[in-house]
Amino acid sequence: MTNIRKSHPLIKIVNSSFIDLPAPSNISSWWNFGSLLGICLALQILTGLFLAMHYTSDTATAFNSVTHICRDVNYGWILRYLHANGASMFFICLYLHVGRGLHYGSYMYTETWNIGVTPLFAVMATAFMGYVLPWGQMSFWGATVITNLLSAIPYIGTDLAEWIWGGFSVDKATLT
């Protein structure tokens, strides 16, 4: 008598996708971080989109817009906390995903590794562009945190950091 999960037409699909998945025997929970990265990214995009509908970036009204989101917008408080904690979770999953690849020697497969390094550089470039590249309109915190390693370069570090910042334009707490 055959097992129902292998003979029933609908259950057979679920069985071949989840139970008898054709995967290596050494696969572990470490291999879930790529999927978790996708979930975190989708969460960041959705919550960020809804938060941006109510946020004001002017330094005089930014705090009031955040309190408006938390108090007056339906489930605004949970959107804010999901967005903030989702960003942390995204980077935790990112570092664990790269760490898993390093641990298991995935860098030996150069094509696959380079396909993975490309989105990593894209994430870093997005962070850089979001905080530093709008010359004259950048966040002081973002500019100093992202470019503080540049200022450690001997002789040219300070000038290089100021050039990346766009001169002495870093002055306010928010992007306006």
Swiss-Prot record:
On whether Methyltransferase is a keyword of this UniProt record, the answer is: no
Example GO biological process term? mitochondrial electron transport, ubiquinol to cytochrome c
Provide the membrane topology annotation.
Multi-pass membrane protein
Q: Which GO MF terms are attached to this record?
A: metal ion binding; ubiquinol-cytochrome-c reductase activity
- Keywords, comma-separated and alphabetical: Electron transport, Heme, Iron, Membrane, Metal-binding, Mitochondrion, Mitochondrion inner membrane, Respiratory chain, Transmembrane, Transmembrane helix, Transport, Ubiquinone
Q: Where does heme b b562 bind?
A: 83
- Chain residues that bind heme b b566: 97
Q: Which PROSITE patterns match?
A: CYTB_NTER (PS51002)
Q: What CDD domains does this protein map onto?
A: Cytochrome_b_N
Concerning Pfam families, the annotation shows:
Cytochrome_B (PF00033)
Q: How does it assemble?
A: The cytochrome bc1 complex contains 11 subunits: 3 respiratory subunits (MT-CYB, CYC1 and UQCRFS1), 2 core proteins (UQCRC1 and UQCRC2) and 6 low-molecular weight proteins (UQCRH/QCR6, UQCRB/QCR7, UQCRQ/QCR8, UQCR10/QCR9, UQCR11/QCR10 and a cleavage product of UQCRFS1). This cytochrome bc1 complex then forms a dimer.
In terms of PANTHER family, this protein maps to: CYTOCHROME B (PTHR19271:SF16)
**Cited function:** Component of the ubiquinol-cytochrome c reductase complex (complex III or cytochrome b-c1 complex) that is part of the mitochondrial respiratory chain. The b-c1 complex mediates electron transfer from ubiquinol to cytochrome c. Contributes to the generation of a proton gradient across the mitochondrial membrane that is then used for ATP synthesis.
Record-given protein name:
Cytochrome b
Native organism = Myotis leibii (Eastern small-footed myotis)
